[in-house]
Amino acid sequence: MRRIVYNISEIEPYINWLYFYHAWGLSGKPRAEKEKLKAEALDMLHSWEGEYHTYAVFGLFEANSEGDDIWLEGQKVRFPMLRQQHPAAQGEPNLCLADFIRPLSSGITDRLGIFCTTVDGGLEKKYRSDDYLNMMAQTLCDRLAEATAEKLHEEVRRSIWGYAPDEQLSIEDQHQERYQGIRPAIGYPSLPDTSANFIIDQLIDMSQVGIRLTTSGMMTPHASVSGLMFAHPKARYFELGQIGDDQLRDYAQRRGVPVQAMKTYLQSSLIKK
């Protein structure tokens, strides 16, 4: 298990400004508008150096898959996954993240990375008396949490896990996801169930970097990211899409969660009747 503290200046190069502009409604707007906002953002960012930091926790676990489940720590921890019920394109398989972990029947132990990243909680409260500065700080914090995940993933591939020690990718290449493996985050298209954060918390104790979970598995500070890291060379991102009542019930049973509660967690992923 690793807990890492980063200076703001270490993370700044990894920020994907396209998403920052999108958050401000500047996608497709003139470059001058974007550059003006970015200059203001950088001034704020640089004022945080030394006083505030970003944080990461990473754990590397022995893992094997069995059906749509990933088993960790010698089959002590079950991490159920969801499978596409409608492939993205005709002839494509219905994907599940468990597909990218060696099956238990192979007799070969695989590995799975589990992580979380966040920012100093004080940053989200620092500018509450000024709506504009508060929005600037919040959107910057969101980008910092994502950029910290990007830098952590680079370090994991090259050295911590070390499955791609000779990787030489620019940050732009990394933003284009040209690396080996994937880093799906909780709440994103292939992992929509926020309550999966309770399993992640059980494994890596997110409280050690100040992350707390709500009853639905949402994280505070808001500017936090959690998820999984897969090393399989053919692992790829995909969108789960909508699932039927049959898979909902099966998944709830595997998670040990009442079906009604799981319906709440997966509301946006359920096929509408």
Residue ranges and their predicted role:
Residues 1-134, 139:
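Active-site loops and adjacent core secondary-structure elements that bind or stabilize anionic groups
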Residues 4, 13, 108, 137, ...:
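Active-site-proximal structural scaffolding
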Residues 56-68, 154-254, 259-267:
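Compositionally biased, low-complexity/repeat regions
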Residues 118, 124-160, 237-238:
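Conserved mixed alpha/beta catalytic, RNA-binding, or beta-rich assembly cores of soluble enzyme
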Residues 267-273:
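Extended, compositionally biased alpha-helical segments that mediate assembly or anchoring
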